Amino acid sequence: MAKAKPAWSYETAIAEVEQIVQQLESGELPLAEVVEQFQQASQRLQQCDRFLRDKQAELDLLIESLDEPPVPPQ
């Protein structure tokens, strides 16, 4: 039976990027691995950017709704 892929997590993605950066900074990876790791980090950062933009839009809508006058009870 195939394993279910865990749900995406911002915190996990950032931890993966930090781990990749540590590997890159070690200077011990062959060039092909450096390029592959850099691509993975770039993809994770793009995912994080989309996530943060979406959450910012949600927050903006919530804040905007706070500025609206309350609806009187019927």
UniProtKB/Swiss-Prot annotation:
It is an enzyme of class 3 (hydrolase). It is found in: Cytoplasm. It catalyses: Exonucleolytic cleavage in either 5'- to 3'- or 3'- to 5'-direction to yield nucleoside 5'-phosphates. Its main location: cytoplasm. GO terms for molecular function: exodeoxyribonuclease VII activity. The keyword Mitochondrion does not apply. It comes from the Bacteria. Its EC number is 3.1.11.6. Signal peptide: none annotated. One of its GO terms (cellular component) is exodeoxyribonuclease VII complex. Keywords: Cytoplasm, Exonuclease, Hydrolase, Nuclease. Heterooligomer composed of large and small subunits. Belongs to the XseB family. NCBIfam families: xseB. Bidirectionally degrades single-stranded DNA into large acid-insoluble oligonucleotides, which are then degraded further into small acid-soluble oligonucleotides. This is Exodeoxyribonuclease 7 small subunit.
